[in-house]
Amino acid sequence: MIYEGKAITVKALESGIVELNFDLKGESVNKFNRLTLNELRQAVDTIKADASIKGVIVSSGKDVFIVGADITEFVDNFKLPDAELVAGNLEANKIFSDFEDLNVPTVAAINGIALGGGLEMCLAADYRVMAASAKIGLPEVKLGIYPGFGGTVRLPRLIGADNAIEWIAAGKENRAEDALKVGAVDAVVAPDKLKDAALALVKRAISGEFDYKAKRQPKLEKLKLNAIEQMMAFETAKGFVAGQAGPNYPAPVEAIKTIQKAANFGRDKALEVEAAGFVKLAKTSAAQSLIGLFLNDQELKKKAKAYDEIAKDVKQAAVLGAGIMGGGIAYQSASKGTPILMKDINEHGIEQGLAEAAKLLVGRVDKGRMTAAKMAEVLNGIRPTLSYGDFGNVDLVVEAVVENPKVKQIVLAEVEGQVKEDTILASNTSTISISLLAKALKRPENFVGMHFFNPVHMMPLVEVIRGEKSSELAVATTVAYAKKMGKNPIVVNDCPGFLVNRVLFPYFGGFAKLVSAGVDFVRIDKIMEKFGWPMGPAYLMDVVGIDTGHHGRDVMAEGFPDRMKDDRRSAVDVLYEAKRLGQKNGKGFYAYETDKKGKQKKVADPSVLEVLKPIVYEQREVTDEDIINWMMIPLCLETVRCLEDGIVETAAEADMGLVYGIGFPPFRGGALRYIDSIGVAEFVALADQYADLGALYHPTAKLREMAKNGQSFFG
C-alpha cells in the first residue's frame, strides 16, 4: 500500500500503475469532507514524490463514485469572513490542480453517480471512462451556489461553453450516452468492464499512443472563443436562463457570468474568478435557505427510515373511493410496485378512477418515461371492484371518500369488518380529527391519517397523522408505504387541519382580511407570486375549490375559535353562495377558459366585483409590504404554534411540510427559516405592528421569550 487513509488509499496495480481509491469509512457514500480533502492532498503529494509511478487510475470502493461535497460542513464554512472562505476554496482547488498537473497520465473510472465535487475530481483527470449505468452532473445551483472545485473552469474548456452552461445552469444528472456525446467522458463501457477499460487506456497513454499532455492542455488555457462568439454564447444564455430561473434564484446566471469573466484567463486565474463568485453566492439568503432545505430533507429521510425497523411490508393495498383522488392514489401505488384494489359504490366512480390512472400513464408513455409494456403492467396492478370480496388479504386500506366525518365513520367501520385483524386503515382526510374518526372503530390502534395532496402524482408530501390511539406499528407501516409510493412522509399529531392546512388557513385568513379591506385580489396575487409563491392566494383558492376552502375554513374556525373564527362574512362565503366554486365549474375569483391544448387558463371576470361588494367593509390604503405581512405573519405564527403544541416534532419537519405541501417559496426555506432570516426579535416587533388585525397576528409567549433571549429556530 503506497498510501492508506480513512477515505483514500493508493495501491500499486501493475507496471507502475497505481489506483487512487475513494472509500470513506463508516459512510454509505463517498463525499468531499475535510477529511477526504486532507487525505487527497496527502495522496497527491505521495504520488508526485514517487518517481516509479507511471500512471494513475481514480476509482471508488462504493456503488457511487462521489456524491459531492459534504453539505453539512457548508453551514459553518459559509459563516467565515469572505477572505477566509476564498482562501480556503483556493487551497482546496490547489489539490485538484496539483492532481491535474501530475507528470503521469490519469484516468477516472466512474462506476456510479459522480456529482458536484465528484465530477470536478474527474474533470481534473486526463481521461474519463464511465460505466453505462452511471450518471454525472453539477447540481450545485439547486443549493443556491455553483460548482466551486473548478467545475466552471474545466467543464467549458472540455465540452464547450454552450454545453457547459446547459449542464451547470440546469444542475441535472446526465446519463453516460449524453456525457459521451458532448465529450465529458472519453468512453462508456459495461460496468463489469470498467476497471479493465481504465487500465487499457492508461497503458496506451503511458506508451505514448495517446498524448495525455496534449489532452490536458485545453483545460489549462483560456476558452477557445473569440469576442463575438463569447458575446453570442454568454449574453443569449444569460437572458434565457434568467427568464427560466427568475430573480429569486441567482446562482444559474451568476455561474454564466463567472464562466464569461474567466473565459480569457488560463486555469489558475480562472479559478480565482470562480472562488470570488462562489463566495458571493454562498453569502446569499437564497443559498442559506436552499442549503437549509437540503439538510432538512436529509433529516426527514433519516426520520422516515427509522420507522422501517418496525413497519410491516404492504404487499397488497386498497383504496376506498375511486374518482380522481382514488385514481391518483391507485396510480401512485401500482406504478411503484404495490398492487391495489380500487373500490367504489358505483361504476361511474370506478370509470373516473381508471380514467385518471390511464391518463397519467399515457402521459408518461408519450413523454418516453415509460414503455407501453410497463403501462400495461401498472394497469394490471389496479383492480377495480364494487364489493369487498377480495379485501381479506389487504395489508393497508386508504379511505378517500367525501370529506364528511359521518360518511367517513360509516365507511371505515364497514371496511374494518371486511379485512384482517392487523390490516391498517388510513384516512385521506385533510382536516377531520383522526381521533374523532377512530371512535367508530373496534381497533383504533390500527387507524391513522394519510393525507395526500392534490394532484397526488405531483405533490411530494404525505402527512401521516397519529391519532390518540394509533399504534407505532400503524404509523410506521403507513410511513413505509408512503415512501414506497415515492412520497416524502412527515408524521404529525392530530389536530384540526394537522400541520399543512392548519397553517394554510390563517394565510387565507390574511387574504380574506385584505379583500374585505378593499384591496384588489389580482394585486394581492401578483405581489405574493413575486414574493415567491407558485400562485397567488385567490388563484390557489380557485384551484383548491371554493367549496373545499369554505368547508375547511369552518372546520378550522370550530377547532381554533379564538383566532380563526370571524363573525363577518368574507370573500369565500359570497363566492360559495354565488356557486362560483373555482376551476371546477369555471368561475371563482377568476373565470376559466380552455386553451387549444385543452388546459384551463384563468382570465379576468369583472362580474366578480359585484359578488364581492357586500364583504368589502372599508377602503384601506396598504403598501406591497403590508400585503406580504398581512399574509405571511399569520402563516408563520401558526407554524410556530404547531411546533410549540407538538403537532410537528422539529422545525425542519415544519418547514419541509410547507415547502412540499403548499409550495412555500424554497429560496426562503420555510416559515421558521423565514422568521430566522428576519430575526426572531424583529419578526415579533413586526407582528406587533399588525396586532389590531386580530389574534392571528399575536406572537406566542414562547416566541417572545425566544426574541428576548436572542434565540433562533435553526441556530
From Swiss-Prot:
Active site positions, chain numbering: H451 (for 3-hydroxyacyl-coa dehydrogenase activity)
Region (Enoyl-CoA hydratase/isomerase), start-end ranges: 1-190
Keywords attached to this entry: Fatty acid metabolism, Isomerase, Lipid degradation, Lipid metabolism, Lyase, Multifunctional enzyme, NAD, Oxidoreductase
Annotated site, Important for catalytic activity, chain positions: E120, E140
Chemical reaction(s) catalysed: a (3S)-3-hydroxyacyl-CoA + NAD(+) = a 3-oxoacyl-CoA + NADH + H(+); a (3S)-3-hydroxyacyl-CoA = a (2E)-enoyl-CoA + H2O; a 4-saturated-(3S)-3-hydroxyacyl-CoA = a (3E)-enoyl-CoA + H2O; (3S)-3-hydroxybutanoyl-CoA = (3R)-3-hydroxybutanoyl-CoA
Annotated positions binding NAD(+): M325, D344, V401, V402, E403, K408, S430, N454
EC number, UniProt record: 4.2.1.17, 5.1.2.3, 5.3.3.8, 1.1.1.35
GO MF terms held by the record: 3-hydroxybutyryl-CoA epimerase activity; delta(3)-delta(2)-enoyl-CoA isomerase activity; enoyl-CoA hydratase activity; long-chain-3-hydroxyacyl-CoA dehydrogenase activity; NAD+ binding
Family matches, as Gene3D superfamilies: 1.10.1040.50, 2-enoyl-CoA Hydratase, Chain A, domain 1, NAD(P)-binding Rossmann-like Domain
Keyword Lipid metabolism in annotation: yes
Annotated pathway: Lipid metabolism; fatty acid beta-oxidation
Family statement drawn from the similarity comment of this UniProt entry: In the N-terminal section; belongs to the enoyl-CoA hydratase/isomerase family. In the C-terminal section; belongs to the 3-hydroxyacyl-CoA dehydrogenase family.
PANTHER family, per the entry: TRIFUNCTIONAL ENZYME SUBUNIT ALPHA, TRIFUNCTIONAL ENZYME SUBUNIT ALPHA, MITOCHONDRIAL
Subunit and partners: Heterotetramer of two alpha chains (FadB) and two beta chains (FadA).
Protein name: Fatty acid oxidation complex subunit alpha
Gene expressing this chain: fadB
